[in-house]
């Protein structure tokens, strides 16, 4: 895994820099080439407007992260390593594979992202439609632990037509530099009827939260959380209640060190097809009423699956907004200070 204190990333063709201290408590982004030009040749007003643009803009991650295919559903380890989902066909682990998991790291020497690497088998499952037509090799929605040693994700590798079970949750571990064969998170986590997806751990490191359409919820897809007992057995998941869940769809929790969770919902009153919301944890399974993050990140399109890079100062997500200039869905970032509403 990559370890660094300062590295750069190309963002939509512009040179943007990530500066992380050793404990990754700060994350600073700037557009160096444009900023240098402004300070060298521009007036104070030009410099101020340039700084404003950098701070206020929503930025496309650019190549090689975004491609002509769909990218999204990203997650970060503490060292900045990113795991995300892509439909790109050029690096498929197997022909005809619809969605695979990729790992991307920063290259300090080139000042850009390294070419993403397909995680390959056994993490990414090849299509097995000859076994069941639902087994398309769809591996998505990863969540990596801060130490970079464990990834939870959703897969259709065990999907069955009868009973209909499209997706289950799996976990893989990095052992001696090799990712282990993913293990199914059994019932009561994965179920036949729930179509579980978007797993993650809260900051306590013990509460596994995920989305499920199982019975007993408020709507279509709700967010549930569960813990293991002393013997490692998963306890019955607890619905996170009406301050999080509605009669619509809620999914994809991610939590910062202040206890604030960010997630996706298509509840009424939003800006578009899917919006990003936030809520602050009050205690176990208790949250403040969710608030919409506002028009800086939410558009009339679908804005989904928030993630928090190291340092806590920025928010990333994926969207099919009109300026998705690489593919139908691209990955974007902005400064958290631009969010209209937070708990």
Task: Identify the residue ranges that each predicted region occupies.
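Accessible peptide chain termini
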Residues: 1-2, 343
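Serine residues within intrinsically disordered or low-complexity segments
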Residues: 3, 7-10, 43
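Secreted/luminal cysteine- and crosslink-motif detector
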Residues: 4, 31-33, 210
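Bacterial N-terminal signal peptides that target proteins for export
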Residues: 8-31
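Bacterial N-terminal signal peptides
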Residues: 30-41
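Short, conserved micro-motifs composed of acidic
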Residues: 46-343
């Amino acid at each position: 895994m990559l370890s660094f204190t300062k590295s750069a990333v190309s963002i939509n063709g512009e040179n943007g820099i990530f500066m992380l201290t050793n404990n990754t408590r700060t994350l600073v982004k700037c557009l160096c080439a444009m900023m240098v030009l402004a300070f060298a040749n521009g007036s104070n007003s030009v410099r101020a407007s340039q700084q404003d643009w950098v701070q206020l803009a929503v930025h496309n991650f650019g190549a090689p992260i975004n491609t002509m295919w769909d990218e999204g559903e990203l997650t970060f380890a503490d060292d900045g390593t990113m795991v995300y989902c892509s439909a790109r066909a050029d690096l498929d682990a197997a022909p005809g594979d619809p969605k695979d998991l990729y790992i991307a790291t920063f290259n300090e020497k080139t000042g850009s992202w390294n070419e993403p690497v397909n995680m390959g088998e056994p993490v990414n499952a090849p299509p097995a439609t000859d076994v069941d037509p639902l087994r398309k090799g769809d591996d998505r929605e990863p969540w990596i632990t801060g130490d970079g040693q464990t990834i939870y994700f959703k897969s259709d590798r065990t999907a069955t037509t009868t009973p209909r079970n499209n997706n289950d949750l799996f976990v893989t571990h990095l052992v001696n530099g090799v990712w282990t064969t993913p293990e199914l998170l059994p019932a009561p986590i994965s179920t036949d009827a729930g179509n579980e997806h978007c797993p993650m751990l809260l900051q306590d490191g013990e509460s596994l939260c995920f989305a499920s359409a199982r019975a007993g919820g408020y709507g279509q897809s709700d967010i549930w959380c569960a813990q293991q007992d002393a013997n490692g057995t998963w306890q019955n998941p607890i619905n996170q209640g009406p301050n999080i869940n509605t009669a619509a769809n809620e999914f994809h929790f991610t939590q910062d060190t202040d206890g604030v969770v960010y997630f996706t919902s298509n509840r009424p009153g939003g800006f578009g097809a899917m919006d990003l919301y936030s809520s602050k944890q009050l205690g176990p399974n208790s949250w403040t009423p969710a608030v919409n993050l506002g028009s800086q990140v939410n558009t009339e399109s679908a804005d989904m699956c928030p993630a928090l890079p190291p340092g806590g100062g920025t928010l990333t997500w994926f969207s099919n907004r009109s300026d998705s200039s690489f593919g139908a869905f691209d990955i974007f970032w902005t400064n958290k200070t631009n969010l209209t509403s937070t708990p």
